[in-house]
């Protein structure tokens, strides 16, 4: 399966913040596609104002979301590649740029 940074996928891995299949954003570098895991930030439909650690994404033709959702940048995790679906949408370059701001803050980069 070919995934790219910025893709929106469904993750079906159980974890502290993923009790059910949920949409997530692929944030891992495209150069690391050979890894057995994929680094993602989950999305949540329960919206809270907490920028830059929550990035609001409005539904669009590009992302195929059904409702406004927040990318939970502070819930960054690696999941097994076989628990990740094919991409159902993508973020715009501007939206991904906002996620990058949150990642730099979270990781002190």
Regions found by a protein language model. Give the residues of each.
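Conserved functional hotspots at enzyme active or ligand-binding sites that engage polyanionic ligands
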Residues: 1-109
